[in-house]
Amino acid sequence: MYERYAGLIFDMDGTILDTEPTHRKAWREVLGHYGLQYDIQAMIALNGSPTWRIAQAIIELNQADLDPHALAREKTEAVRSMLLDSVEPLPLVDVVKSWHGRRPMAVGTGSESAIAEALLAHLGLRHYFDAVVAADHVKHHKPAPDTFLLCAQRMGVQPTQCVVFEDADFGIQAARAAGMDAVDVRLL
């Protein structure tokens, strides 16, 4: 089905790994310390964004005087301990396994590299990917194309010869901005 592509790129959270419930739990825990609230629909709309950008939206919603990068670090620490105990692969991992060795593959994620690498290794999936590009590897995050362009570069594949598997509107916009085809996994 994906034979015409020279490289396959996968978002991580919500696409190949079921991490979203744990991310929400970590946000609830961290925000509870500050008495802050968040809007679940607004959070879903920000799927694929780096943690600091989500923190900024929460701070603005609550009109709080906090540093979004510091709040993001707290959430990252909270989620790191939770995820290794709770994360499960999603069915799209079967696509990853079936294309292993047939095409170069990469992960392009809005998560921090330490978390992405730890999760993929923990689940025995890291060896399937030629590259992992995370939020701390690029200056401009999804919906900018930088994450996926760096994936293509690290795989040694032209961007127009890549397909991206995504579960978030920001990610699909980023793929298109990179000149890549996108598969919206929410429709599979």
UniProtKB/Swiss-Prot annotation:
InterPro entries: B-phosphoglucomutase_hydrolase, HAD-like_sf, HAD-like_SPP, HAD-SF_hydro_IA, HAD_sf, PGP-like_dom2. Mg(2+) binds at D11, D13, D167. GO terms for biological process: carbohydrate metabolic process. It is an enzyme of class 3 (hydrolase). It comes from the Bacteria. CDD domains: HAD_BPGM-like. The keyword Hydrolase applies. Catalyzes strongly the dephosphorylation of fructose-1-phosphate (Fru1P) and slightly the dephosphorylation of 6-phosphogluconate (6P-Glu). It has low beta-phosphoglucomutase activity. This is Fructose-1-phosphate phosphatase YqaB. It comes from Escherichia coli (strain K12).
